[in-house]
Structures are given as C-alpha cells and as structure tokens.
Amino acid sequence: GYQYYSYLEDGDYNMEWWDPKGQTFFWRDDIYNTFYFQEGVNSIYTILSHTWKNLEAQAGVRGEHTHTVLRSSVEGADRTKNRFEFFPSVHLGYTFPNEHRLLASYSRRTTRPQLFYMEPYITYRDFYTAEIGNPDIRPEYINSFELNYRKNFGENTVSATAFHRYRKDKIERLRVPYSAGVTLDSMANVGHDYSTGIELSVSLHPVRWWNTTVNGNVYHYKVKNEQAAGGNTTSSTNYDILWNNLFNLGKYTRIQLDGSFVGPSVTTQGRTDAYWYANVAVRQQLCNRKLTATLAFRDIFRSAKYISDIQTADLRSLTRIKPKYPQITLTLSWTFNSFKAKSTQAKEDRSEMFEGIKH
C-alpha cells in the first residue's frame, strides 16, 4: 500500500505584555517573528501473513520518506530536512486448546516533533516562564518487544503482557535559568530511556448494559541522559492504573466513566509526582444515528495536579499546576453516508467512543 501525509502552517507570533504601572497592555515588537512549516511523508508498506494450523505469523515493513521545511525570521534558523527510514514489525501467535493464546511481537516506531518544538524564537507562557524551540530536534525512535498471553471466558477477557521498550533520542522539556526570576524551557533530545515491565488487563461484561475494563502497568524505568543541561542518568519504578466503564442505556444512549492513577516518575532533571483524575461522557444519537451529540467532562474532581521538581547544579524549580474547573466539551457530528456493517457498529459501541475524553 501507499500513504501520503501533508501538513502546512504559515503564520506569525506576537505578544501583548501587561504593564502593571500603566495598567494596560502593549505590544512587544522585539519578540515578533514569522514562521513557515511544511511536512510531507510518503509511505509504502507491505504485510505478509500465513497460518499453519494453530500458528499464525505476520511480518511487515514500512518505508517512509519525510521532507520538512522550516522557515523563520530568526537569522540562521531555516532548515530543510530529508529522511528515508524503515520500520519493520514481526508477530508470532499460537492458540492452545481451550482458547489460551500466546503472542510474541517486535515493532519499530517513530514520534516526530511537533511544530512548537522547533519554533526558534522566544515565547512566554507567563511572566516567569519563557520558551524557545529547537529547529535541530530529531524524531524519537522506539523499539518494542512484547510477549502477550490472552484467555477468553465467553465475553470476558484476561490478558498479561511482558514488555521491553527502548527509546532512542528521547524528546523531553529541559529548563535552565534565563534572567532574574525567569526560566527558559526548550525541547531537546536528552538521550535514551528504557521501560521493562508487565501490563495486566481484565475486560468484563457483567450484564448486558455494562462493560468494564481495568488495565494496570508496573515497570522499571531508566533514563540515560546525554545532555549537559544539568540532567542525570537515573531510574524509578513506575506504575499506572486505568478503569474504564461503558454503560448502554437503551439503543442510542451511552455513558462512559473512567478513572486513572499515574504514579511518580523520574525525569532527566528531576521527578514528577503522582496524580489521578476521572472523566465522564454522555453520547446521544438522534435522527436514525445520523446526528451524534457528545457531552464530555474531563477531570471532574479537579484532581489532575501536575507537580514537577527540577534540581540541577544551577537551578531549583518547583512547579505546581492545579485546574480550577473541569474541562467541558460538547461535540456535534452528522453522518451523511454510512458504509459500515452492523457488526462493525456493534464493535465500536463497546470501544472508546467519546471525543476529548482522554488526557
């Protein structure tokens, strides 16, 4: 197969600054900048699969050519890049008697930097936090090895996955002193990180109108710093839990309730604290399923506190962020034509359906 992806953004950046003495805003002409960004990705891929009795094998490879152009009014910041890369994947599965299934897999993936990671000029989030992009930032590359066991009990499923993931050129936000009382943040390829652990998942269908899924991860996390900006090579034991519930209230009404707990973790410059949050969403379909209205509330208890503690040789920065209100979104969509089979529709009804529900 072949796939083409293109993204284009052309604009400028300016900022109004608050003058406490004059009690008015004024434009900061010294931080006015223009930018142009275009990215095109040409991809070709092939997948081969075969089954021998209870053994299934699948191998694939994806070749990508990525062309990016960055233009800016900042002198010396223009960049044109071309990359050609391969991303292989291999999956081997075996089904034992009584529906016991074992699957081993390997895949190589990438995460490309977003535009604001690369914008090469100073911006401000607030009076005390300045930011600057890095036009030379590179994509992340992830090599993932997994061994999964799965057992079905009717409509219920239990699975366990052992995994090891190695990420090269990890992208992370770094913070350094900038001026009196002001820090400067920038995105950088800080080095490599490693995650080795186990994921447990239980999916239950207790009654006709309720589906519930619990996922939990426990893994050893190590980040190997290769930057000189006060970073460290350190490790931690990380964990997270997600509980998702889907309620079918009639043919056209769905309610989704989920809660997550994310444990503390180390970073190259310090650590982040644990936090938890809960979301709820209601979806109503009207006009013979052509009109869909979704009302979603994210972090309904305002518990998703972000606490980051950065400690380097020349900086100590403690950041606490707590939301004042839940985030509320209302989404309306109209389906003009639907070619999906009924079996596909039923499958979607039991999956993640609500836009804006995940953090």
Q: Which sequence ranges carry the predicted segments?
A:
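Conserved C-terminal beta-signal and adjacent last beta-strands/turns
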Residues: T234-H359
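Surface-exposed extracellular loop regions of Gram-negative outer-membrane beta-barrel proteins
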Residues: E39-E75, R83-S89, N98-S144, H164-D185, W209-H220, N244-S265, ...
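Transmembrane beta-strands of outer-membrane beta-barrel pores
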Residues: Y4-L8, W52-N54, G63-V69, Y106-R112, ...
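Surface-exposed loop/turn segments flanking beta-strands in extracellular/periplasmic regions
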Residues: L8-F35, R79-R83, F116-P135, I171-N189, ...
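Outer-membrane beta-barrel channels and translocator barrels
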Residues: W52-L55, T95-E99, I142, N152-N156, ...
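Residues on the lipid-exposed face of transmembrane beta-strands in outer-membrane beta-barrel proteins
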Residues: T46-H50, V90-Y94, L147-K151, A162, ...
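Outer membrane beta-barrel strand-and-loop segments of large Gram-negative receptors
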Residues: F26-Y32, N134, R138, F153, ...
